[in-house]
């Protein structure tokens, strides 16, 4: 936009906003639709990072500055990246950038905001051995992150035993009512232990007040719930079993999984010879 003197300044991008010491950080983003872009992100992929911290920042779109949850300026985006890590020194210097600095592995699922523009986070704490996944609801109350344990989600949800052990069955916050959270949990029912969708209702201070079974006694898993914004179809997800196969390692495994009716996630393996499947 031209300034008061009808002059236009052009700045070229894109800019790298944050740089982590970890490998393959994961991030989730959302906008309040007015003046802020919220995002939460990890040190790296939980497979590679133990511990794996979870951070929160927002972009002020008027000043184009990166800020922490209290509004403190961390950097001007055009001037360079803000560097994060998982040391004690970093935690002491930038405490308001941290949602969680656990002793194990965090992963982020969603960023939302309540009616007062306070950020709300869906997150998972994964044990060091990756065999236990705990769902948490984290909400900024103006002073601190209130982290509420929702449920244990077992381990990885898919049917491949020794691959992608940090893949949880999934959770999602309703952006229209951030006190409602939907989680996929292993539940014992008529068909044995199957992943079902459970709704958690929390109060304004982040305490669970009730739960409700959305699916029950299913024959196959219900995983990866997701709220469709601005739609009459509010909640969707995946149904059935799933296998993860690395391309180039097991064409036979792919054919076997397909023959069993399993949806297959094809994971490309770098540096390995790939075989043509069809």
Regions inferred by a protein language model and the residue ranges of each:
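Extracellular, repeat-based ectodomains that mediate carbohydrate processing or recognition
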Residues: 1-278
